[in-house]
UniProtKB/Swiss-Prot annotation:
Segments passing through the bilayer: none
InterPro entries: Man_deHydtase, Xyl_isomerase-like_sf
Organism encoding this protein: Yersinia pseudotuberculosis serotype O:1b (strain IP 31758)
EC class: lyase
Official protein name in the record: Mannonate dehydratase
Keywords of this entry: Iron, Lyase, Manganese
One MF annotation (Gene Ontology) recorded for this entry: ferrous iron binding
Gene Ontology annotations of biological process type: D-glucuronate catabolic process
Record function comment: Catalyzes the dehydration of D-mannonate.
Length: 397
């Protein structure tokens, strides 16, 4: 596996020097300063590559080229935004980058309710609390029809949760959900968010799939022409939220994506922390079934709680993800590829990390502090080395 590290650009508190010292050789980044839907100029891409090269690092994976909401809703200027996306892909390929991660989540990217959940050892993790989210939907956002998405017990718990909240608590929860987490290119006020939700009225799972299929049929031929590996990121959490459909959550969704545009360039980001939230997602089976389409991996683990829809992010080698078996399955796929002459290792990044040690006293991007990810990378690296020595002695290091 190629060891990579996500970097949010010059404003990221984690520097390129930090990344280099962590042992990563590749950087996963994007041009976050360019608005959604605007073409990425070759000059801007090359400038970012030069910044990385100055520190002996390479831009391994683009994460992400955001998809404009008009494309997801198949409305407004969707055709122009698709053409812009196609040109951005051509420009990325012209600069020698071969992998692009993206997602098709409506409105919000990844979602959490608590960005500072304290663990027993004093470190802090990200958490999704189903009852807190219900309190937001039912009593803060007041989304019509939201009660249909929660059990009677959850609704009672959500009301009690809301009644115990202060104004500061309400503002914090609202901000955590709709203000935009790292990697999300858009944040909203409550009124803006309600208006955006209204744009999805009448768009169910079948319609969103149709809209994504239209996008893929326009994008994948370009990826084939220029040699790009497109790697769709799963929904996080992997289920419908806010009355919005989600269509990249299960192995059945992966099969649909493969069949919709059956090309090796139409692939996946295997995010174990996203898919792994669902107990019915067999991560190893997913890797074994779609191994040739897995172009990028995000390795982390989560811990499901008493309410199975509530979870927090665990240590990389703890929680509900069997990281040993996951890494072994990835290495098995790498060995298969190398036997066929494809020597490109699968890029991997330690996804998220606990805020811990000195980082507890610093301003950090939620989930993306340095020391927690350093720990995660070191742990995964150790698993990989042990597996290679034991089972894959001929696998190119």
């Amino acid at each position: 596996m190629e060891q990579t590290w996500r970097w949010y650009g010059p404003n990221d508190p984690v520097s390129l020097d930090d990344i280099r010292q962590a042992g990563a050789t590749g950087v996963v980044t994007a041009l976050h300063h360019i608005p959604n839907g605007v073409v990425w100029p070759v000059s801007e891409i090359k400038q970012r590559q030069a910044e990385l090269a100055a520190k002996n690092l390479v831009w391994s994976v683009v994460e992400s080229v955001p998809i404009h909401e008009d494309i997801k809703t198949h409305s407004g200027n969707y055709q122009q935004y698709i053409e812009n996306y196609q040109q951005t892909l051509r420009n990325i390929a012209e600069c020698g980058i071969d992998t692009v991660c993206y997602n098709f989540m409506p409105i919000l990217d990844w979602t959490r309710t608590d960005l500072e959940y304290e663990l027993p050892d004093g470190s802090k993790a990200l958490r999704f609390d189903q009852i807190a989210f219900a309190a937001f939907e039912l009593h803060i956002l007041k989304r019509p029809g939201a009660s249909n998405d929660y059990t009677a017990e959850e609704q009672v718990q959500a009301e009690a949760y809301f009644n115990a909240m202060t104004e500061a608590d309400i503002a914090k929860l609202t901000g955590n959900i709709i203000a935009g987490l790292p990697g999300a290119e858009e944040g909203y006020t409550l009124d803006q968010f309600r208006a955006r939700l209204a744009e999805y009225d009448g768009i169910d799972k079948a319609q969103l799939r149709e809209n994504m299929a239209y996008f893929l049929r326009a994008i994948i031929p370009v990826a084939e022409q220029v040699g790009l590996r497109m790697a769709v990121h799963p929904d996080d959490p992997p289920r419908p939220i806010l009355g919005l459909p989600r269509i990249v959550s299960t192995i059945e969704d992966m099969q649909w994506l493969k069949e919709t545009v059956d090309s090796i360039h139409n692939g996946f980001t295997m995010c174990t922390g996203s898919y792994g939230v669902r107990a019915d997602n067999d991560l190893v089976k997913m890797i074994e079934t779609f191994g040739d389409r897995i172009h990028f991996t995000h390795l982390r683990s989560t811990c499901r709680e008493g309410n199975p829809k509530t979870f927090h992010e665990g240590g990389h080698l703890q929680g509900d993800v069997d990281m040993y078996s996951v890494v072994k399955a990835i290495l098995t796929e790498e060995q298969r590829r190398q036997s066929l002459g494809d020597m490109r290792p699968i890029p991997m990044r330690p996804d998220h990390g606990h805020q811990m040690l000195d980082d507890l006293h610093k301003k950090t991007n939620p989930g993306y502090s340095a020391i927690g990810r350093l720990k995660g990378l070191a742990e995964v690296r150790g698993v990989e080395l042990a597996l290679k020595r034991t089972f894959f002695p001929d696998l190119k290091q």
